[in-house]
Curated annotation (Swiss-Prot):
Similarity comment: family membership: Belongs to the major facilitator superfamily. Sugar transporter (TC 2.A.1.1) family.
Residue numbers on the Cytoplasmic membrane side: 1-26, 112-119, 168-178, 230-305, 364-366, 418-432, 476-486
Transmembrane segments: 27-47, 91-111, 120-140, 147-167, 179-199, 209-229, 306-326, 343-363, 367-387, 397-417, 433-453, 455-475
Record's protein name: Vacuolar protein sorting-associated protein 73
Main location as per UniProt: mitochondrion
InterPro entries: GLUT (IPR045263), MFS_dom (IPR020846), MFS_sugar_transport-like (IPR005828), MFS_trans_sf (IPR036259), Sugar/inositol_transpt (IPR003663)
GO biological process, one term: protein targeting to vacuole
Source taxon at top rank: Eukaryota
Annotated Gene Ontology cellular component terms: fungal-type vacuole membrane; membrane; mitochondrial membrane; mitochondrion
Keywords, alphabetical: Membrane, Mitochondrion, Protein transport, Repeat, Transmembrane, Transmembrane helix, Transport
Organism expressing this protein natively: Saccharomyces cerevisiae (strain ATCC 204508 / S288c)
Gene Ontology molecular functions: hexose transmembrane transporter activity; transmembrane transporter activity
Length: 486
């Protein structure tokens, strides 16, 4: 899914630091890499069922070794079924319940991280990911797949909120945006990694090993976290001044006195009423600082309207139909190379994300978002026509273009604009609301697409094109330019 993340707002600040006040140390690089592996886990789970879903669900049988029965393989000898019978609706449910877990995880993530710390919360989520991944790998039933997908969804939904908090808090002044962009890039890398592993393993004998890959990543991430220091800002916010200084010394490579000076600056920030870490909002439905109060506040109507349309609309343009079901879509016209083509589409996604991360800070929001949305509408329409008329080459070319033009604007900008149209005191609740909208939109597409596509075929992309066209009109009339000059 693509976008789900309130953390994408960090892309708005991507720029090279004006001065090398703080160098990037090996310890800091290691901490950023370890944290970013959580984003890779998110991308991996988001698309892990894309390539193998046909052989997983007994819809197709691809036997890699003729004359060698499955019962004689390592998996077959240990009682793992060759496939799990699933219809289109069940495939949609197994894919989409990841989003249910994601909503739960992202909703409570900030509270978890503020109480237990960024490091310990990440360890909890890695543990949950390990358990969920093992359940998915070992599952011989529809129910087992659902349970595992919900668990990894909770883990990934939480990680995708905690990771940007950690990176923002450990990054030296001037580097926050550049390092923060790692979240989005690593999500795309996770998707690419899944498709790369799927190239040799998508057949009726070995598809489970694709699912096992997420277990290995989670285990690696879990043990790597033990060498990472806790966020010094979180430590200071909890009164652990000495620990904060030591953490800052290790991460930044500064002396104890230099760390003490920066800690003193942070303490002055706290005393001035400016929160050092992202505040926790009330988790109750009807509390004084709750999401329900935000939804009822009439002063937020215009900004909330913009957030709702952009964050739902981002998903209803259909991009996750490619991320979640791209192999099945392309295989209808080009079955021999569908997985390979999907891999290269994911590679384009990574490259465009890196380019956008470097340039987006210098471009105005509204024209870029308009351009991206209009091009998404045009390319989705052409993809629909190509599918309906069996134009294989046209479908492949415009699948690449569709992914590229979405990534250049409609992917990151709704999250950036979400922050910029909100009042400062409502920003945390606005992010939470927007993230929920995005998760719900992803759930709807993940669940309904295989069912609707089975009935409408290419016409489903024409529907996406009409929705994207409508969103373009909304952006033109209702969305303000939020980028400040300078």
């Amino acid at each position: 899914m693509n976008r789900i993340l309130s953390s994408a707002s960090l892309l708005s600040n991507v720029s090279m630091p004006r001065q090398n006040k703080h160098k990037i140390t090996k310890a800091l690089c290691y901490a950023i890499i370890v944290a970013s592996i959580g984003s890779i886990q998110f991308g991996y789970h988001l698309s892990e069922l894309n390539a193998p879903q046909q052989v997983l669900s007994c819809s197709e049988f691809d036997i890699p070794m003729e004359g060698y029965p499955y019962d004689r393989t390592w998996l077959g000898k240990r009682g793992y079924k060759q496939c799990i019978p699933l219809n289109d609706e069940q495939i949609g449910i197994v894919t989409s319940v990841f989003c249910i877990g994601g909503i739960l995880g992202s909703y409570f993530a900030t509270s978890l991280a503020n109480i237990y710390g960024r490091k310990f919360s990440s360890l909890i989520n890695c543990t949950l990911n390990i358990v969920g991944s093992l359940i998915i790998f070992n599952s011989n039933s529809y129910r087992g797949l659902i349970i595992g997908r919900i668990l990894v969804g909770i883990s990934c939904g939480s990680l995708i909120v905690i990771i940007p908090l950690f990176i923002k808090e450990v990054a030296p002044s001037g580097w926050e945006g550049l390092l923060g962009s790692m979240t989005q890039i690593c999500i795309r890398l996770g998707v690419l990694l899944t498709q790369g592993i799927a190239l040799p393993l998508t057949d009726s004998y070995r598809w489970r090993w694709i699912l096992f890959g997420s277990f290995l990543i989670a285990v690696l991430n879990f043990f790597m976290w033990f060498i990472v220091d806790e966020s010094p800002k979180w430590l200071l916010a909890h009164g652990r001044v000495t620990d904060a200084k030591l953490s800052l010394c290790k991460l930044r490579g500064v002396t104890f006195d230099e760390a003490a000076q920066e800690i003193q600056d942070w303490q002055l920030q706290i005393e001035s009423g400016d929160p050092l870490i992202e505040p926790t909002t009330t988790n109750s439905i009807s509390g004084s600082n709750s999401l329900w109060k935000y939804l009822r506040d009439r002063t937020n109507v215009k900004s909330r309207h913009v957030i709702t349309v952009l964050l739902f609309g981002q998903q209803f343009c259909g991009i996750n139909s490619i991320v979640l079901y791209g192999t099945k879509i392309i295989s209808q016209l080009y079955p021999q190379h569908a997985i390979r083509i999907n891999f290269f589409i994911s590679m384009v996604n990574v490259l465009v994300t890196i380019l956008v991360s470097l340039l987006i800070h210098s471009l105005p929001r509204k024209p870029l978002l308009m351009t991206s949305t209009v091009l998404v509408s045009v390319t989705a329409f052409i993809m629909g026509i190509a599918m309906n008329h069996n134009k294989m080459n046209l479908l492949i070319v415009f699948s690449f273009i569709y992914m590229g033009v979405f990534t250049m604007g409609l992917n990151p900008l709704p999250f950036i604009i979400m922050r910029e149209v909100s009042k400062p005191q409502d920003m945390v609740l606005a992010q939470r609301y927007g993230t929920i909208c995005n998760w719900v939109g992803t759930f709807i597409i993940a669940y309904t697409f295989p069912i609707i596509h089975d009935v409408l075929s290419g016409y489903v992309f024409i529907i996406f094109a009409i929705i994207a066209c409508s969103i373009s009109a909304f952006i033109w009339k209702k969305v303000p330019e939020t980028k400040r000059s300078g």
